[in-house]
Design a protein with these regions (language model features):
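Short beta-strand elements
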Residues: 160-167
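Conserved interdomain hinge at the start of the Helicase C-terminal
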Residues: 148-160
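Short, hydrophobic beta-strand segments
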Residues: 138-142, 170-177
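Helix N-cap motif at beta-to-alpha junctions
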Residues: 146-150, 174-179
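C-terminal active-site/capping subdomain that shapes the small-molecule cofactor and substrate pocket
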Residues: 15, 167-170, 179
Length: 179
């Protein structure tokens, strides 16, 4: 069988073998990080919040964040890049680097962040959310779990409510006002 996704633990093993030095795994489950055991840390987004500085931050397959099925995916991806930039710039030494692996190197978000033009992104994103009636211009609720189907049935007949689904046992409810 072929590994389709490497995963953090397997990536740590591969990197240790390649570099012939210890690599520390950092995830939200990591208890204590011993910064004296290694100079290389590999992990999930949690690493951005658990490490104070870095010489290099690498995002492998950043498209998973940039193109995720969440209406806030670009905003969340941008936040990760900003956190990474803070890590490589926070030490009183030569600034480090943030490297992003993507199949979409010309995505507008990369250019705007590189130029430090967050205002343009915010303006475009605000117009997009207004057009699609996403928050804060509309309201969205994801209903799933035990009792979800009965709850959805109870919403039948309510005007100004759009119910999408079911999709894998979940419904998306959209409304232009909170009532």
């Amino acid at each position: 069988m072929k590994n389709l996704r490497l995963g953090v633990t397997r990536a740590v093993e591969e990197l240790q073998a390649l570099l012939n030095e210890p690599v520390i795994e950092v995830t939200k489950e990591s208890d204590v990080i011993d910064f004296h055991k290694s100079r290389i840390f590999l992990g999930t987004e949690a690493a951005l919040h658990r490490i104070d500085w870095a010489d290099l931050v690498l995002f492998a397959d950043f498209d998973q964040e940039l193109l995720a099925r969440r209406y806030r995916c670009e905003e969340q991806a941008m936040a990760q890049l900003i956190l990474a930039q803070r890590l490589v710039s926070s030490h009183k030494r030569v600034a480090g680097k943030v490297v992003v692996q993507s199949r979409q190197p010309n995505h507008p978000l990369f250019g705007l962040i590189a130029a430090g033009d967050i205002e343009t992104w915010a303006s475009v994103e605000s117009k997009r959310r207004q057009l699609l009636e996403y928050p804060p211009y509309g309201h969205i609720a994801l209903i799933s779990g035990e009792g979800a189907e009965e709850f959805i049935k109870g919403l039948n007949g309510i005007t100004n409510l759009q119910i999408l689904g079911p999709n894998e046992g979940a419904w998306l409810i959209r409304a232009s006002n909170p009532e």
